[in-house]
Curated annotation (Swiss-Prot):
Residue positions binding (6S)-5,6,7,8-tetrahydrofolate: 111-114
Gene Ontology cellular-component terms listed: cytosol
Name of the featured protein: Methionyl-tRNA formyltransferase
KW GTP-binding (keyword) present: no
GO molecular function, one term: methionyl-tRNA formyltransferase activity
Gene: fmt
InterPro entries per the UniProt record, alphabetical: Fmt, Formyl_trans_C, Formyl_trans_C_sf, Formyl_transf_N, Formyl_transf_N_sf, Formyl_transferase-like_C_sf, Met-tRNA-FMT_C, Met-tRNA-FMT_N
Pfam families, per database record: Formyl_trans_C, Formyl_trans_N
Length: 314
């Protein structure tokens, strides 16, 4: 018999999981998401991606500011759910919420736990130069991403991958994994193991929330480190530098790059193809964004703004 589920999620990453749970025939009793927030040029209130998809599917949507009140906890209990599925929801779940569903609460986490517990596992994996990442279905306990693991899938990370690329790879993979986990739970076949028994990176690391102060590119770092920094922050908040354009220092976000040959003082433009010197070697810019403008290929940018040495980026 299909499970009666509560779904809790907010961003685009969570939408495929909601879709897969519905496709697998599970009953979604309620969808919890964050409240609508101002966005866009008009700063109009915009519902979250999960709220929009839930409304499209005809599912009831709740947007509590907290789950710590007795009222909110009683309301969640009233749904009589078998389990809750949590994907990048954004609110802390108190123990009363964790205990409410019959079989507990299950989280889809975008890393190979115990590596990169916390808020920004996708960004941190790319920034650290990890060889692989993945998704895990974990039964939530009182700790920060410390629960027992039910299922996992791995994917390689290449030098060409940005955080956006990895996000788009893991979202559908995780959706399928969670749906299969709930199918197994329905059959009474879901098995949990301790994170230390998963055969993944044994050292616990924490994926701190990305701070915009981290986004400034440091050209005096090694080229591969600069590449990982750029790709790990793409597209948001976007790694940036200042580039001299028509005598003015213009802030540019670099969204995609590749390793390149060349040598010079860190930050020096080495040719007319946006190859920039680092501590050792260089990177070539492939995609960038000026403030207030859409992202564009480097070739298109150079067509309108030709740049040649000598020139230094800060």
């Amino acid at each position: 018999m299909p499970l009666r589920l509560i779904f809790m999620g907010t961003p685009d990453f969570a939408v495929p999981t909601l879709q897969q749970l519905v496709a697998h025939g599970h009953e979604i009793a309620a969808v919890y998401t964050r409240e609508a927030r101002p966005a866009g040029r008009g700063m109009k209130l915009q519902p979250t991606p999960v709220a929009r998809e839930a409304q499209r599917l005809g599912l009831p949507v709740l947007t509590p500011k907290t789950l710590k009140t007795q009222e909110s906890q009683d309301q969640l209990r009233s749904y009589g759910a078998d389990a809750a599925v949590v994907v990048a929801y954004g609110l802390i779940l108190p123990q009363a919420i964790l205990d409410a569903p019959r079989y507990g609460c299950y989280n889809l986490h975008a890393s190979l736990l115990p590596r990169w517990r916390g808020a920004a596992p996708i960004n941190r994996a790319v920034m650290a130069g990890d060889a692989e990442s993945g998704v895990m279905v974990m039964k939530i306990d009182a700790g920060l991403d410390t629960g027992d693991v039910a299922m996992a899938e791995r994917v390689p990370i290449t030098d060409a991958m940005t955080a956006s690329d990895l996000h788009d790879t893991l979202a559908p993979l995780g959706a399928d994994l969670m749906a299969r986990a709930m199918d197994a739970l329905e059959r009474g076949e879901l098995r949990l193991t301790k994170q230390s028994e998963q055969g993944v990176a044994s050292t616990v690391t924490y994926a701190a929330k990305i701070d915009k102060a981290e986004a400034h590119i440091v050209w005096s770092n090694p080229a591969r480190e600069v590449l990982r920094h750029i790709h790990g922050l793409s597209p948001f908040p976007g790694a940036w530098c200042e580039m001299p354009v028509d005598g003015e220092a213009v802030r540019i976000k670099i969204l995609r790059c590749e390793l390149a040959e060349g040598a010079g003082s860190p930050g020096d433009l080495l040719d007319d193809r946006l190859t920039i010197a680092c501590k050792d070697g260089a990177i070539r810019v492939l995609e960038l964004q000026r403030a207030g403008k859409p992202p564009m290929k480097a070739a298109a940018f150079l067509n309108g703004t030709p740049l040649t040495p000598p020139l230094r980026l800060d």
